[in-house]
Structure formats: structure tokens, C-alpha cells
């Protein structure tokens, strides 16, 4: 039960961080307060950091909302490709 509650709270933190309601620094401070500076806290902070960096919603090489394509078309005129969680303009996947 405790493990499920922790997972649910963690997913809630990810949603809040990715929606932009509060910033990454505040989220990481809350993790330090609630979980502490240990291995689990470090993993939680790493996931929050990855989610906060993901401004174009690229997940596992898939442009889920089309934001990467729109961004690249607007800025460079090239096609946008998702590389993991990063958006790269005009650079296709090589694998």
C-alpha cells in the first residue's frame, strides 16, 4: 500500500512539473524534503529533470503532439525529428 501511494504521488509530481504549474527547482526541493537525499530521491529528481526538459513532448522517438514538427517548421523550415526526448531539426534518426 505504501509503495503504491508513493508511486501515485510521484506520478502526480511528474504531471505538475510537466504542466508548468511549478518549476523544476521547487519540485526537487520538495523531493529533498519528503524523500531525502538518498538513492530513491536521486532517481526521482532525475526523472523530474528529464520531464522538465521535455518541452516538445517527444517520448521514445515519437512526437506525441506534433510540437517538434511545428517548432522546427516555424524556426528553421526543416522537418523535426524526435531523438529520445529531444527535438532536433533536420537530423533524421540514424538507427
Curated annotation (Swiss-Prot):
Domain BetaSPN-type CS-alpha/beta: 55-95
Keywords recorded for this protein, A-Z: Antibiotic, Antimicrobial, Disulfide bond, Secreted, Signal, Toxin
Post-translational events: Disulfide bonds are critical for antiviral function, and their disruption inhibit viral activity.
Keyword DNA repair included in the entry's annotation: no
Secretion signal, residue range per the UniProt entry: 1-19
Disulphide-bridged cysteine pairs: 58-82, 68-87, 72-89
Tissue distribution of the protein: Expressed by the venom gland.
Pfam families tied to this protein: Scorpion_toxin_alpha-beta (PF14866)
Subcellular localization: Secreted
Main location: secreted
Presence of keyword Transmembrane helix: no
Top-level taxon of origin: Eukaryota
Function description: Antibacterial peptide. Dose-dependently inhibits Dengue virus (DENV), Zika virus (ZIKV) and Hepatitis C virus (HCV) infections. Two mechanisms of action have been described by two different groups: one involving activity on extracellular particles, and the other regulating the immune system. On Dengue virus (DENV), Zika virus (ZIKV), suppress the established viral infection, similar to the effect of interferon (IFN)-beta. Mechanistically, upregulates the expression of IFN-beta by activating interferon regulatory transcription factor 3 (IRF3) phosphorylation.
Family per record: Belongs to the long chain scorpion toxin family. Class 3 subfamily.
UniProt-recorded name of the protein: Scorpine-like peptide Smp76
Organism: Scorpio palmatus (Israeli golden scorpion)
